[in-house]
Amino acid sequence: MLGIADMQPRQLAAQILNFALVLSTAFMMWKGLSVVSDSPSPIVVVLSGSMEPAFQRGDLLFLWNRGADTQVGEIVVYNVKGKDIPIVHRVVRRYGGGKTPLRLLTKGDNNLADDTELYAAGQSFLNRQEDVIGSVVGFIPFVGYVTILLSEHPWLKQVMLGLMGVMVVLQRE
């Protein structure tokens, strides 16, 4: 196996370009999913136990945001103004629709109260158009635990990126 120091400049450049190709392909796939699903974040990870037993911490959720109508009982992912962590909860009430903006009230299945305390200051309901990222259309159990581990232990990100970089550079064609 060749080390980095033993590689010819062209071979090293090819390996670096190969690594860049892998990263850009992943980015293009993410953006493609965003366009198809009409959601800025088409895949999210459940970060808490508020939706148990429907979803467990670490489940990977697939979102769809093409439907403008949301029904009571539907599970949606929304952002709260001023916070950057999406929340996954079930719609328990809906108001308006048609000519007036659709407003939603949500609640976690494992929570005692609705989400009004989680909403932005002065907000009693979610605006379907402005706050909701998408509706859950599918999930894969526990696959998202990698994301949780990476956010709880930041040094793991550096280790994983380093290992991926070494694997790409040392890969033989």
Curated annotation (Swiss-Prot):
Lumenal side: 37-173
Cellular compartment(s): Endoplasmic reticulum membrane
UniProt keyword Disulfide bond present: no
Chain intervals for the UniProt region annotation (C-terminal short (CTS) helix): 159-170
Keyword vocabulary terms for this entry: Endoplasmic reticulum, Hydrolase, Membrane, Protease, Signal-anchor, Transmembrane, Transmembrane helix
Bridged cysteine pairs (disulfide): none
One GO-annotated biological process of the protein: signal peptide processing
Positions of the catalytic residues: 50 (charge relay system), 89 (charge relay system), 115 (charge relay system)
A GO CC annotation given for this chain: signal peptidase complex
TM segment ranges: 16-36
Membrane topology of this protein: Single-pass type II membrane protein
Annotated function: Catalytic component of the signal peptidase complex (SPC) which catalyzes the cleavage of N-terminal signal sequences from nascent proteins as they are translocated into the lumen of the endoplasmic reticulum. Specifically cleaves N-terminal signal peptides that contain a hydrophobic alpha-helix (h-region) shorter than 18-20 amino acids.
Subunit structure of this chain's protein: Component of the signal peptidase complex (SPC) composed of a catalytic subunit SEC11 and three accessory subunits SPC1, SPC2 and SPC3. The complex induces a local thinning of the ER membrane which is used to measure the length of the signal peptide (SP) h-region of protein substrates. This ensures the selectivity of the complex towards h-regions shorter than 18-20 amino acids. SPC associates with the translocon complex.
Family statement drawn from the similarity comment of this UniProt entry: Belongs to the peptidase S26B family.
Domain observations: The C-terminal short (CTS) helix is essential for catalytic activity. It may be accommodated as a transmembrane helix in the thinned membrane environment of the complex, similarly to the signal peptide in the complex substrates.
Cross-referenced NCBIfam families: sigpep_I_arch
Protein's name in the database: Signal peptidase complex catalytic subunit sec11
Protein species of origin: Pyrenophora tritici-repentis (strain Pt-1C-BFP) (Wheat tan spot fungus)
Protein's gene: sec11
